[in-house]
Amino acid sequence: MQFKKLTPPTEGEKIEVKDGRLQVPDNPIIVWIEGDGTGPDIWRAAHPVLNTAVELAYGGKRKIVWFEAYAGEKAQAVYGELLPEDTFKAIAEYIVAIKGPLTTPVGTGFRSLNVTLRQELDLYACVRPAKWYEGVPSPMRHPEKVNMVVFREATEDLYAGIEWEKGTPEAQKVIEWLKKEMGVEVRADSGIGIKPISEFASKRLVRKAIQYAIDNKLPTVTFMHKGNIMKYTEGAFMKWAYEVALNEFRDYVVTEQEVTTQYGGKAPEGKIVVKDRIADNMFQQIQTRPDEYHVIATMNVNGDYISDALAAMVGGLGMAPSANMGDYIALFEATHGSAPKYAGKDVVNPSSVILSGVMMLRYIGWNEAADLVEKGISETIKQKRVTYDLARHIGVEPIKCSEFGQAVCENMREIAKKL
């Protein structure tokens, strides 16, 4: 693979796909993108945590070989563009990548860098776990009941970026066409956006969500939609979701209706209950009955909203990991923004990118290292050694971003001694 300005590591081996499965060497090359704003801060904490976990879990027999690629402001400085071809090529070639937050100029016509990465690499599933860690302040009375994973379709819906500004020739042309050809009146001073929801994209997203529930022995998958209003987009998503469940996973699933009519209200042992919820009701459900939901499969906009709401319930975006997945390529990322006003101040919570690293470790099958990181973070928070975002709720003096990373490493070493 030839790059314009990137130099691959001289050590390490590529992760490969054979017979539909990842083949992970003991020294995999993993692409990382520092990100903008607080990106350098969180990575100075995260890299030592992930490296220490791997070293402790495998006695030095395994090691991540990091390969830096560029996006955002750093890419602009190196390449003169925000998202160079080298970065797409590196992620596609090495399969697994992880990144910090990226800044997209607002209202300037630039498409979101995060959206562009997902669309160009066909990373169609945005996977967002929401899990509470003991000691994290939460507005919920029982945050320990929140343990869900959102599968959000990431290439379509209103976030596809098919829109035109009010007053442009393109917007006027669409408005005129709608009136002339479809008999639909739209105000002349409107901006226009298109909401595509396809059968293909919907079904592959749901397929991935149900397979995740099977692999992780989770009891429910819920299809979230607003099909009562948007019948031919969100309603179609619900219809296609059930088709996947009942045509492709019939041996594994039972519908909520079948549980009621055929099984006396109790799901049969070993079966996954598939059900659907109207989007606005879903926001009530996650607060009032969180333990009844485990995997949520939904479209792009709904998924964005519900995953951020869930993050707030378990400690905020600073505690929220994320992954963008295709069939094999996976890009893990911090969910929070670049927070430029805090850049270089060593104050932000690095847990989002660290926990995204946990997801990454599980994706490559290194569960022992992933478990160690989670235990290290949990222990550090229980000790009330936390950054300002959590400290202000707990009523303790905050520690620095880098100090949090050091504390997690210390706790992992103590935990490893007892294993």
What residue spans do the PLM features occupy?
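Glycine-rich phosphate/nucleotide-binding loop
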Residues: Q2-T10, E73-Q76, F283-R385
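N-terminal phosphate-binding or glycine-rich loops at protein starts, especially the Walker A/P-loop
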Residues: F3-G60
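Glycine-rich phosphate/diphosphate-binding loop of Rossmann-like nucleotide-binding domains
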Residues: P25-D26, V31-H47, K173-R277
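Buried hydrophobic positions in well-ordered alpha/beta secondary-structure cores of metabolic enzymes
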Residues: D36-G39, I95, F151, A209, ...
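Flexible, glycine/charged-enriched surface loops at secondary-structure junctions
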Residues: Y58-V65, N216-H225, F249-K275, W366-E374, ...
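N-terminal beta-loop-helix "entrance" segment that forms/cooperates
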Residues: G59-L83
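N-terminal glycine-rich phosphate/adenylate-binding segment common to multiple enzyme folds
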Residues: K74-E181, V301-Y305
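Glycine-rich phosphate-binding loop
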Residues: A90-T104, E248, Y252-L331, M412, ...
